[in-house]
Every structure is written in structure tokens, then in C-alpha cells.
Amino acid sequence: MAKTDPLTLQQLLAQRHWENPALTQLNRLPAHTPLASWRNADAARGDLASPSQRLLDGEWGFSYFDRPQAVPDAWINGDLPQVGRLSVPSNWQLSGYDAPIYTNVQYPIPTDPPRVPDDNPTGCYSLTFHCQPAWLQSGQTRIIFDGVNSAFYLWCNGEFIGYSQDSRLPAEFDLSQRLLEGENRIAVMVLRWCDGSYLEDQDMWRMSGIFRSVSLLHKPHVRLDDIHIDTRLSPEYRSAQLRVLALCSLTDASAYQLKVTLWRDDTLIAQHQQPFGTPVVDERGRYLDRTRLSLQIDQPLLWNAETPHLYRAVIALLDADGTLIEAEACDVGFRQVEVSGGLLKLNGKALLIRGTNRHEHHPDRGQVMDEPAMIADILLMKQHNFNAVRCSHYPNHPLWYRLCDRYGLYVVDEANIETHGMQPMNRLADDPSWFSAFSERVTRMVQRDRNHACIIIWSLGNESGHGSTHDALYGWIKSDDPSRPVQYEGGGADTAASDIICPMYARVDRDQPFEAVPKWSIKKWIALPEETRPLILCEYAHAMGNSLGGFSRYWQAFRQYPPLQGGFVWDWADQNLTRQAADGSSWQAYGGDFGDMPNDRQFCMNGLVFADRSPHPALFEAKRAQQFFQFQLENTSPITLGITSEYLFRHSDNERLCWRIEHHGEQVAGGQITLNLPPEGTVSLMLGELPSLAGELWLRVEVIQPAATAWSPANHRVAWDGWQLPAALSLPKPDVPGEQPRLHPQSQLIEVVQAGQRWQFCRQSGELIQWLQADKPQLLSPLRDLFVRAPLDNDIGISEANRIDPHAWAERWQRAGYYRLESQLLRLQTDILNDGVQIRSEQAWLADGEPRFLSRKCYRINRQGEMLLEVEVDIAAGLPEPARIGLHCQLAEVAEEVCWLGLGPHENYPDRRLAAEFSRWQLPLGALSTPYVFPCENGLRGGTRELTFGHWHIRGDFHFSLSRHSVEQLRKTSHRHLLRDEAGCWLTLDGFHMGVGGDDSWSPSVDEEFLLRARQYRYRLILTRG
């Protein structure tokens, strides 16, 4: 270690290392792949705990200051009187110090690089520990910080050790010359902001502290410093080479050898041993401190996300007598990644990326992710047909990659670089003074993670424009690791710094011709002249709140056009944080809820799953669209089903097809067939004859996995589909004789009476204001037209209280007066018919005295006690398309169960219903609402033919929702925990409902076919006593 002058704390801080982009570290050791220094080769092979490692996680001393200069010099040598305790790893903001800040683009500090505010929150950590005596006698003892945000200084026993920044990569220091017998004390001063913060402008919560593990590692004096693993496959993929490069600290290269053994479980596959030194490199000779060797492997089991076969390589450093000095080990997956023929290929097969972006986020622990949380994410991804994850937007915890290797996920490893808030975005990427800061974040990532089979693409970072620095770093990666492609979206997604066209939020068919960086439709992009690269969307389908509409269109395009090789949904999990209320209850917070300024409100909640990893309904849509089995109904007489496997590498040796025919939602036929399909195989199966039944006749199929797997339980469902079958001709049912309804006009209302039922209509509004069954009122509010919804995030767009987006749906509806409509009755007419009573009304809905909608209703109450309701709605010209054409009312009864025949079981909307199935469903009332943290329209079920709830039974072809919360309350409430159950239950019955959109959430993204563009709509319902 370079000797450092004994500066006082204030003298050291006066140098302001944290504002110098050319200086990113002092005394930090070079980056390398993870090491464990086993002293037993069998322990290395078994991945047992290494006695050379010691974890320092736990309770540390902690003192908080508003700026580094406020820290007393005495703290370096001993804890201060007011010292507290803080868990490591953690973010200090979640323990009551300072506040987390959520912003997307805008920097949370004034934009003045490389300077940061003088008021720079500072956390002072300390820990005392005893060091093993043997470690003091020989060798090297290192301390490793896996993640510290954003910069820190380190002291050991009062002596300055070093400085580091880059929150997401390890910082490693040599403590050997500073450790003492007995008690040792390390002190770590962490700064919230540094010049590196300008490179970490990711869309996430800005939090600080030691948020990943801290450990000690003892290495012998002669030691392995780094191991590079590379696998090469033969052209026919039947044999492979395992190439190993070992870098060592040696006193005499001739006295040491390297031995590599490759294992498959307990079976030795290959081994090789050779002395150190390389062939001559140039006119100055060769390397003496490194060696390269190669093992030939015949018929290797290849790694891929479907069958993630792994071997274990043990790299042993031996002395001249063959005695083990130390061993390192790592998992090895034999696979080959390439871009050839315009396609991204793995082991010769063109991949279809079923991907998601994932932040390291936990609602209670912030940016601290432990192994159970990581495994839970991986299992959920695999269970929902994801095969890839992009580490957005920084290198993840080192354990994440080992788990992805073992469970099978393709990974895009991304450098911790984003300068989204700069103007222009590429300002720092084109500034030579920042080159070193950029470079270390890319090169150190590659040096740490290169041995992982799961990593198939390197990424130069996110949303940082395109500058000369990107071109240089692209070249460095291609030279240092030619085994993987490189991608980078900045500067237009198709610059020379990317092997893959990797746009974000490009539409399927619509161009977005932005100045300088046009975003073409994905179909057009791959057809551009001279473009030969594959296209993989680095971000698409912005899953913010009630979203993901139109997702299936992307997958139709991916399957139709081979160069469109999938993409990564934005994003995996909502990034809200848990807060405690005064009464001890907890609630979920988003931007601004900690008093953080600036903030971007709920824009942190874009997940397919809630922060606690319970699913959004959109997750099921993604699972269905991405499923690995495709079905085609080839014939209905007899019923013949075609099945195609989209697995590229695995046989369907654990799959069973289950099929059933349902009549009005009840099974009338079914069966099971074991599937045995080769990769990419197809089969046609005859299921049986078509039943001769009238009415709703549906075929439903699903593929399950009978046996549990590493990532799923037994009988896990992997794919499904359904079709309406041709039904026999049905004859009208003869009317059942019943009591003739009677009309009872009154001064304020019109009442119709029939066999214990009474319907009451208001003479002033023409609306049904009460329905009594056996004298029991059913309504707490009239059955009334409804044209609005509580705005979705996609409806709000980029509108804020002080910045209105005039194109956002919510603003257009607001300007048109849809949320403040007043009713005017134009006509009310009653008629006595041969088989009942008819009431006709014509009602205008006005805003500012101007008509917006004209609603004509015909209520026909017959002898069977049914109310046939026909609704016709006209929309005034020149107005925005409404969210819905429907009815709503407040029911008096709150029944426990809801039963319906229609699409379900989960929430679905016209442009997000691929995953919904037609059947007869029954759920508790509370299960019908989706608890989005930011309240909005939710819980709709479409394609409904029948609905039964309490004493209500409704037939027709409609959408419905049932909720304890009105549209008005949802619209005006900022957080889920602030919603209050209202009296009764709100029922909405929609004849028509617009889509939710979801290509992005800042521009109108509902496809034309899912907008209510017609000027007139008609629908029909039948309401009867349940």
C-alpha cells in the first residue's frame, strides 16, 4: 500500500476528493472476479464456507452529520459520546436519518458538475473486531465493501486507508499493515453526494449508506489475484474448450503451478496442470505472473436459461511440491453468444428475449437485497415465463449473478452510468475530464462479472446520450471480452457503440420522429436500409399502475419478424417504501411522502408486481403473451388442436395438456394428454367431437408441469388458451306466465310493481332511484350514466399540479367537463304493454350549460319480473373520447361473494385481456379490487354474460366492477391507505370501456381500436332478482 501522509481529518476533507471526476479512488485494489481463498480444494468444489472469509455485517456504530466538515477529528480514533447503532447493510434514510428522495430525470441536487452542495449528509460508521492471529503473521488481509452510496473514506486503527466511489461495485482495500493483535477499529465516513452522483441519475430512490455486505478476506502472500473463465464451443456444439487465465502475485514463477479441475457434481470431467508464465507477447518478453491453460471437453451439457447445466471449476495454486497454497472456484456454463446473420444467438439458436428490467428494491429495506429476496424474484420471473433480466441500471449484488446462473436467466449487465438530467444528456460523455470516471464503471463491471454464464450482453449504461467515451468503452469491451455483444441505447439506440438496436418505448407500428434521435416503429427499424442488427427493446410496456394495454401486439410482432427478438418490460417491482403511521399501522409511500424535494411522485411505481412481490394483473398478461407453448384450433369437427413448443433447448418431458369444454361455464367434456415435444416441435392432437349444445360453448386448454422443478411447484401452469366453439341453434325460450306489472304514477316518482318487486323512477331526472325486493331497498343512489373513470397513470401522463399536459386524457376529460356533468331531463314517457310496462327517458348531460352526452334509456319490465334496459348514448361532436359508456349505482347490500360468467378471474380491460379466460368465476368481493398504491380505475371484468351479486342478477354483454370505493373517491385520493369503505357497494356496468394503454405512460398510448371514437353507442342489459 502506498504510504499516505498523516493528515488530519479536516486537512483530508479540504482536498474535496468527492468533487474531482479524475480521482475515483485512493489505494483501492484492482477489480477482479469474486475470490474466496479456500485452503482445501474439496471445500472449493463444494462451495463450502471459506475460513479465509469473515462477514462484518451486523450492528455498527453510527453518527450522522449534515456535512463532512462537521465531523470532529476525534471520531477517527474513537466513537463520539452520542454514537448510535445502525445495521449494516442498510440505507440510513430508512432508520430516521435524513430523507430518501425519489426523482426520475431531475438531479436531486443543483446541476453543477463536478460540484455538490456543501450541505452534504454524512454518515460515520465504526466497528471493532478481533482479527485471527494467523492472519497477522503472514499473507494479506483485505476489507471488501460490496456497495456504498455514494463515496466514502476508510480508516483502520486511526490510520487512513483509502477512498472510493461508485455505489454499485466493490471497493477493496489492503489492511495488512494496519491490523493489530486484539481489538481493531475501522471507521467509514460515507458522503451522500459526490461527483459520481452525476453519473448515478437513475430513475429510483436516492438513498445512502453501506447497503451491501462488508467482509474480510485473507489471502496468502503468494496468491491468485484474478481468474478469467471463457468457454468456446465447436461449430457443431458437440465439444468445448474451457479456457482459464490466472493472474497471481508470485515471488518466483518457476516455483509454482496452476491446476484446474472441472467437475460435474462429484464426477471429475477434466483436469490440467502447468507452470506459470505465458508465451512471448512482444519484444519485451512474456508475463511471468499469469498463465493460460485450456481443457478439452467432449459432449458437454450446454448452459441456457431453459436447462442451466453448470459445472464447477476449481483453480488451485500449487507450490513446487504440488502442495495446495490456495484455491478459487466458480460455476461454469458452457455456452456461446453471438450476433450472426442479423440475430442474437445462443448455442446457435436465435433467442426470443422474454425480459424485464429490475431494480434492487425492497419496500422495507430499500436497496438492501438478501438471498431469499433475490430467489423470490427469480422464481416469480421463471414462473411467469420470463427468461431474461436487465440489471437496470447498475451492476447488481454479486450473488444475483450466481443465482441467475443456477436457476437460468439471461442477464444484461449494465454499467452504473446514467446522466439523464444533463442538458444535453451526452455532456459528460463527451467531456474528456470525465473519461476516467466513465471508464472505471464499465471496465470494473466486466472485470468483476465476466465469469458468469448468465451474462449474455454487456451494457454501457443508460440514458447518457452518446459521446466519444461510449465509442471508446465499446471498443475496450470488444477487445477484452469478445465473447459477448455490447448494447447501448443512448444517442438513438442504434449508434456504432451497440451490436443490437435497443430502443426504449418504440411502438410496434407508429414512428416517433424526435429531433436528432428519431424513434421508429420497431417494424420499420429492422427494415431500414443497411441495418443488419437485431432489435431488442431495452425498455418497453411501461407497467405503471393499471397498465400494459396492447402488450400482445408486441408479441405478435416478435413472433412474426425474426429480427425483433423481444425486449425488457419496464419494470419488475413497484418502488414504494413502507412508512409507519402514528397509530403503528404501515402504509406505502412514494415520491414526496418524505418531504423530499424535488420529487416525481408515483412515477417510481411501474412494476409488474407490487413492492411486496404480490402480482399486478398485468403480470398474468405478460405470462400469457410470453408463454412457451402456442396453440391453434385447427378444426372443430372433430376438435383438433395444434401445439408448438417455443423451447429452444429442452424437450417437454414434464408437461401435460389438460383440456375441457365448458357450456355456460360448466364442464361437459375434458381430458389430459402427456406431451412429448422436442425443442421447437409441433404436434396435432384430436380432442374429441363437438358437443351439440346451444349457448356459450368454449374450449379451454392449459399446459401444466406435473413434477416440481427448481423454480416451480408441482402442477405449475405454464401456458393456456381458449376458443368459443360453434354452438347448436337455440330456440327462444317460451315466456313463463307471470303477474302483469302495474304502473303507479306519483307526484315525484313513477313506480312499477310486480310480484313483490317495486321499481321507482324519478320524475325530475328520469333515473331509476330505487328497486325494492320484498320491500327491501336495493339502491343507495340512482342508476346513472357514467362516462369517466378515476384516472390511470397512463391517463394523467406528465401532468402535475403546476405543469399540465394538455394531451393527457385526464386533462382533456377535465377541460370537456366530464367530471362535472349536470343532468337535464328532456323527455319521460310511460307505456303499458301487453306483457309489461315500458318507461322511456331522454337525458342530456351538460357542462357549463353545453350538452356533452345525450342518453336515451328504455326500461321494459315484463311479467317474469325482469327489467330489460336498452341504452343509447350520443356524444357531442368535437369532444374527447370518453373513458367509458356505462352506468353506475351504489348498492345497499354488501354480499360476500360475486359470481359471473365472463372473462376472469383477474382484472381485465379491452386491450389487456389476452390472459383472461371465459368461464364461470366466483370470488370474494374484496378480491375484485386491485390495490394499486396510487388509487385509480381498477377491478374491471369484461366479456361478461351473467353477473350475480347478492339479490342482483344481470345478463347481457358488458363489463362490470364492484367496489367499496366510488369513482369520485378513487379520483380524489392520493394513496391506497387513505381510501375509506363507503356505505354499500358501488356497481359499474359498462357497455363500452376504452383501453388502458401502456406503451408508455407519458403520452396517449391507447390504440385506436380501443378508443371510443364512435358518436353513438348502444348496449342492452337484463336485470332480475338474484
Swiss-Prot record:
Amino acids binding Na(+): 203, 603, 606
UniProt-listed Enzyme Commission number(s): 3.2.1.23
Residues annotated as site: Transition state stabilizer: 359, 393
SUPFAM superfamilies: (Trans)glycosidases, beta-Galactosidase/glucuronidase domain, Galactose mutarotase-like, Galactose-binding domain-like
Record-level GO BP terms: lactose catabolic process
Record keyword Hydrolase present: yes
Catalytic activity: Hydrolysis of terminal non-reducing beta-D-galactose residues in beta-D-galactosides
Entry binding sites for Mg(2+) 1: 418, 420, 463
Protein residues bound to substrate: 104, 203, 463, 539-542, 606, 1002
Any GO CC annotation of this UniProt entry: beta-galactosidase complex
Molecular function terms, GO-annotated: beta-galactosidase activity; carbohydrate binding; magnesium ion binding
Catalytic residue list: 463, 539
Alphabetized PANTHER family for the sequence: BETA-GALACTOSIDASE (PTHR46323:SF2)
Record-given protein name: Beta-galactosidase
This protein's encoding gene: lacZ
